[in-house]
Every structure is written in structure tokens, then in C-alpha cells.
Amino acid sequence: MLRRLSCLVILLSSMVMLPAAQSRGSAPAFDSAKAYEHLRQMVLIGPRPAGSAALHSTRAYITKQMAAAGLTVQEMPFTVQTPIGSVNMVNLVVRLPGRRTDRILITGHYDTKLFRDFTFVGASDGASSAAMLMELARVLKGQPHEFTYEFVWFDGEEAFCRDWDECKNPDGPDNTYGSRYYVSAARKANALSSIKAMILLDMVGARNLKLRKDGEFAAAWLNDIVWATAKKMNHGSTFIDLPGDVGGDDHEPFSKAGIPTIDLIDLHDYPEWHTKDDDLNHVAAGSLQIVGDVLIASLPEIEKRLMTQR
């Protein structure tokens, strides 16, 4: 345990001691075909609940694909007590150094919810966010940026009990295990202050994608930048100007720690959520393209805002 904690402190400390990014040539564009293929490959693995062999295979796939893009994945292992017992989990981290060591986290979860009575492959809820992070990391690797970008694939976002709050207890909810662990570990390593913003992608693959503004835990200025960017890019029909509060997602622990967050999630308009129909028939590469393009275009504005804050 002491050795694991020592390694974790080194990992988190290294996140705030990074060399400046080098200028690069022409950067690649976001390719939704690549992102969709990552999504498809993860769906083919099957259900991927935390602690399963299938999720281990998913980690191996992500690590291999990131290595092919010239990026190194670092593992953040931890063990938690859940309603089904002790479960070993692993967050995955890829860092793209910027001119500053202060970080913008770009995150999502890569596990799927445990269902015992039907096959749940989580095409949008799990695979879409994990696939988006892989393609975004590949693309942003080739673009100079002021802040360090840190991509985090969270384990254990999904609840083990059938209903989301069925097994909630005073010590914590039955969900968001990976993000809560990350925040706790960063706090212990005195690394929280270097996180200037946290962007969460969750359920962004639906064919008829509708993203609403979370007003419960998201920072209004982050919502404003992303939605204004989407409008300029003629994607107002996807980034709709309606409220859609989202609690119990991976941005919540960061928001409670005082970090500005945003959650891009199609929760209120995706009837396939947590059903057997969250499959390849209900997701589309075009939705991934819209989110990827808007997010990449929003990042310079987010950085500009952060540089003017005192």
C-alpha cells in the first residue's frame, strides 16, 4: 500500500512539473471515422463493467491505440468497496504538455453499467466518451497550446446497483468511483490547484444528439463559451439552449472541489440510456464529429478566459 501511494504521489506531482510544448507543424483534423471505429471496437468487446476482464481488454485497447499515436498512457490503480464487494479499478491518464504546467482536464468514463438481465454494451454511455478522448488526444497532440491538456478515462462511473441511487450511503454514492478517487488523490498530493478547468464528455454519440446546459455543477462561463462556439459553427440544433441539470456524474467531485467544470451529455433526450438498445444502431459518427469540432474550437477561448482570471 505504501509503495502504491508513493507511486501515486509521483504520478500526480509529475502532472504539475511538465516541460513546455514544442511548436508543431500542420495539425491533423478531428476524424469522426477514427473515433467511431474506436467506439465500435469497444462495443464489440461487449459489456465492460468495472473490475471485469472485458474492461481490462478495453484498457489494453486504449493503451495500444494511444501508443500508436505516440502517446503514453499512465495507469492510476485503486481499490474501492462497492455494493458487490471490493473492486479493483484503474483510471487512465494521457498528458499533452503545454507552455504552462496548469492543466485543463478533458475526461470521460470507459466502463459500462452492470446489468445482469440483459446485455448492455453502452455504445453512447461509455464507448462514445472513451472514443472521443482517444481521437481528441491524437489531434491535440499536434497543436500548440498554452495549458497542459490531461486526458482522463475514469473507471467506475457507473453504479453497480440497478437504480442509480439505490445503494447510496452516507460515505458516498454508488457511482463516480474513479473521479472521486482522482480528486481525493490530487488533494492529498497538493495537485488540485493546478487544475484550472475540467471538461467531461459523457453520452455524446446519439444519432439525434441533443446536449443541454447543466446548471447544477457546471460553470456558467464554460457553458457560455462552448454553446457560443457551437452556435457560430451552426450546431445550435445539437447544443440546444435548454437547461439539463446533471448530478451524479464525473464532473461533480471536481465542481465540489472548486474547479470549473462542464458536462457535455445527452441524458434527457436519449431514451436508449441504460437499455439494451444503447448499441451501434443508435449512435452516429456525425455526432462525434460535431462534438469534436466544437470542443477543439472552444479550447482557445477557454484558455484565453483562464489567462485573464486572477
Language model: regions and residue ranges:
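Sec/Tat-exported extracytoplasmic proteins
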Residues: 39, 43-50, 66-73, 96, ...
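Acidic/histidine-rich catalytic neighborhood of metal-dependent amide-processing enzymes
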Residues: 117-225, 246
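Active-site-proximal beta-strand/loop segments in catalytic clefts of secreted hydrolases
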Residues: 42, 76-78, 96-98, 107-111, ...
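A non-catalytic alpha/beta surface segment that caps or lines the substrate-entry region
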Residues: 26, 37-99
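Stable alpha-helical elements in mature extracytoplasmic
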Residues: 31-41, 54, 58, 62-65, ...
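Second-shell loop/turn segments in exported
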Residues: 24-29, 43-56, 80-83, 116-127, ...
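Bacterial N-terminal signal peptides
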Residues: 6-17
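Active-site-adjacent substrate-binding region
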Residues: 79, 197, 204-310
